[in-house]
Amino acid sequence: RPCIAEMGGKNPCIVTARADLDHAAAGIVRSAYGMGGQKCSALSRLYVHERVADALIVKLKQQMAAVRIGDPTKREHWLGPVVNRHAYEQYARYVDALRGNGADVIAGGRQLREDGLERGWYVEPVLAEAPLEHPLWKQEMFLPILTLHRYRERDTAMRLANDSDMGLTAGVFGSDEDVRWFQRHIEAGVTYANRQFGATTGAWPGYQPFGGWKGSGSSGKAIASFYYLPQYLREQSRTVVE
């Protein structure tokens, strides 16, 4: 019987100099912090062209400041708690590791215990500009923590985006030509372009093929093409003698 193994992701997004920054900010916040970053398809690595980085950071901070954190059973709250005490403590360790190893924590970083949040593991979403040698660029955290790097040449951005053992999902914000370039070179099984409802996410079940590359999985599903179809077939030699 065929086996589909989905092994997680360390998912990147590239924002080019020609991106719609409002769409980019919306998609980045939703993807990095939705469900508390506790999903395999969450965005955790952001590469932004240096020409638009400052403007995008302003928009990201505005959207992050508007996030309402609290009881997820109440509709007015967009961000609920992390899953348990271990995740809550890991969050604090990761934030300390960012600050202690040369990163600039641009927004977030606090564990929240006031204003009715003492009965749960609530944390602020984090945006941090981190040096490329920081180990958290490589580690899947499963938390609302996003690292950012400014790039000058888009080939550098692509090299960095692909510099991972994983390849589940990836996103881009840019022009039509940027999108074509991205899709030719990115090493990920599920890609999105200019999607303000989530820069990275999984495939839409029943409508899109799904499958990770590299360490993110073996095989795919949804029978999207002849690449996957043979995995669900078995050869049988039949001989009839009359």
Task: Please describe what each predicted stretch is.
Residues 1-131, 155, 193, 236-242:
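ALDH superfamily catalytic-core signature
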